[in-house]
Each structure stands twice: as C-alpha cells, then as structure tokens.
C-alpha cells in the first residue's frame, strides 16, 4: 500500500508539539530527522536530544488529502512554515531493509554476516547476526574498531566482559575467536534478549552469561574488558569498568568522538598504560593494559 509523507519543519522546542499534531491529524507514525546538517552525539541524562532545526515526518495513508493538514500547520505556525509532501511508492520495506546489511570483514579472521545471507568464507570466523532491537551490527565505526581490536588478540582460554553488550556482537565475536567465557552486561532488557538470541544462533549460548547491572557477578575480574557505549557513561563509570579488569589485563573503550578522547585518556590513565587513540572517521577507540 502506498503512503504519503508530510514533512513539517520545527525547532527543538516545538518538535514534540508538531509530532502530537501530526498524530492527532491521523498520522500512522511520526519520525524526526535533522533539517540541516547538525550532528547530535549524546543527550544529557533524562533528555531526548533533538536538532535545533528538526523535521517532523508524518506517515499517512495514501487516500488522505494533505491540503487540510498543511493548512492546519500554516494556521498555527504561519503561512511560511516549511513543509514538504511526498508520495511513497509501494515497496517490500522488510526486503529493502534486509538488502542494506551485507557481510563485513574485520581484521584478518573475522566476518560479521546477516543471518539471512550466505557466509563469504566458510573457513573464516563467522558471526551470524540479526540486528534486532539493539545497537551493534558492525556498520558503525565504533563497533568496527572494537571488532578489529578483538580480531588482533589471542583470546584462546581468556575471560572477557562486554560492558554494554547491545546485540551481543562483541561478546559473540570474542567467543568465536576463542574466548573461554564471556559476560555481557547491559541496562536494557531488550539488549539482553537480542544478545541471547544471537548467541543461540551462533552456538555459543552456553559460554555467554548475560546480566542486567544489578545482577552481575560481584568481585569478578576478567582478562579483557570491552565497552562500546558513550563518552559520558565511560567517564562516570570509569572506576567500575577498570575494576572489572585483572592486573595486566586488557581494556578497550569506544563510542568516543576524537574530540572526547584526550579527557578519557587522562581518566583511564589512572589504572591503565594507555595506547594512542585508534581513529575511524570522526570516532575512536582507546585501549590499554591494566597496571599491576
């Protein structure tokens, strides 16, 4: 079934109001996008961060007449309110989405493959993944940086903590690369469920332990810890994350912009001999060895 998109430009302050109006006028769904080209990286605690110039996009059935809807917004926000009306052709959107994800190689041994595709190299270390509801498909630079780091390590017989496990991509990759035991921790129950599903898909569910933070093992230290989250939590939880690493163990953190790296290098240098940042696009990974 074809659809109509009605796009109304708003500000960060008026975007929620515009969204509610679109829903009240019969929109089946409303999404936000940047009306300019302004990146938003990290909201404050409890804040839903929006762009200064935000475009609200209402999705309507094709038989809906857009003229009265546009007139409604012109009445409320002025005749010059920016808007756009588009007819969306009928497509198999699930198939379109699935076509977007292709197998990807990280380092020398590791491939991340959507579960609905054939693996390019059956002799490689292949992780089959469904993105599900949790972040982490390998397409984001921070995930790629962590996967490359894991591929570079000798993980045979090692224990590892994936702090903020998301889809489970890093935890599962570590197990497929030879880790003996991996603990995944996440604040989101949906992430725990996605990690569990992906672990079963890859035949490593017996080796992967998944916990919400309040349930994680006490006084446990791993040979290796990886945390691909955001700069704010990495800073605030630095003591907790560092405490998960054994003396002389390894740690990698990502989800960090290049501009945020110097501060976090200083923070983690309390506990680790840190290496220079590894950069990809505008993001970076920091890694180091725990001081004895």
Curated annotation (Swiss-Prot):
Residues reported in the UniProt entry to bind S-adenosyl-L-methionine: 143, 164, 186, 228
Top class in the EC scheme: transferase
Subcellular locations according to the entry: Cytoplasm
Reactions mediated catalytically: L-lysyl-[protein] + 3 S-adenosyl-L-methionine = N(6),N(6),N(6)-trimethyl-L-lysyl-[protein] + 3 S-adenosyl-L-homocysteine + 3 H(+)
Domain of life: Bacteria
GO cellular component, one term: cytosol
GO MF term list: protein-lysine N-methyltransferase activity
EC number: 2.1.1.-
InterPro entries: Ribosomal_L11_MeTrfase_PrmA, Ribosomal_PrmA_MeTrfase, SAM-dependent_MTases_sf
Record key words, sorted: Cytoplasm, Methyltransferase, S-adenosyl-L-methionine, Transferase
Predominant localisation class: cytoplasm
GO biological process: methylation
Family: Belongs to the methyltransferase superfamily. PrmA family.
Biological role stated in the UniProt entry: Methylates ribosomal protein L11.
Name of the protein in question: Ribosomal protein L11 methyltransferase
Organism: Tolumonas auensis (strain DSM 9187 / NBRC 110442 / TA 4)
């Amino acid at each position: 079934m074809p659809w109509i998109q009605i796009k109304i430009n708003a500000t960060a302050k008026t975007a929620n109001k515009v969204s509610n109006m679109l829903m009240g006028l019969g929109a089946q769904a409303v999404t936000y996008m940047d009306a300019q080209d302004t990146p938003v990286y990290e909201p404050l605690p409890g804040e839903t961060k929006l762009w200064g110039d935000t475009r609200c996009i209402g999705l309507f059935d094709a038989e809906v007449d857009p003229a009265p809807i546009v007139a409604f917004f012109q009445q409320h926000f002025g005749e010059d309110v920016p808007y756009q009306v588009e007819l969306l052709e009928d497509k198999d959107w699930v198939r379109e989405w699935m076509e977007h994800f292709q197998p990807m190689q990280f380092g020398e041994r590791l491939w991340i493959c959507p579960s609905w595709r054939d693996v390019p190299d059956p002799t490689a270390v292949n992780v089959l993944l469904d993105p599900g509801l949790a972040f982490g498909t390998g397409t984001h630079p921070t995930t790629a940086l962590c996967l490359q780091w894991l591929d570079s390590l000798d993980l045979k017989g090692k224990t590892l903590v994936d702090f903020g496990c998301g889809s489970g991509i890093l935890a599962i990759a570590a197990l497929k690369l030879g880790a003996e035991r991996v603990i995944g921790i996440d604040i989101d129950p949906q992430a725990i469920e996605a990690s569990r599903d992906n672990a079963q898909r890859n035949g490593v569910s017996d080796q992967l332990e998944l916990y919400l933070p309040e349930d994680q093992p006490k006084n446990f230290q791993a040979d290796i810890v990886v945390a691909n989250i955001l700069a704010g939590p990495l800073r605030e939880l630095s003591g907790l994350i560092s405490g998960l690493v054994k003396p002389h163990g390894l740690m990698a953190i990502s989800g960090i912009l290049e501009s945020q790296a110097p501060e976090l290098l200083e923070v983690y240098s309390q506990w680790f001999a840190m290496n220079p940042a590894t950069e990809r696009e505008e993001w970076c990974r920091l890694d180091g060895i725990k001081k004895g």
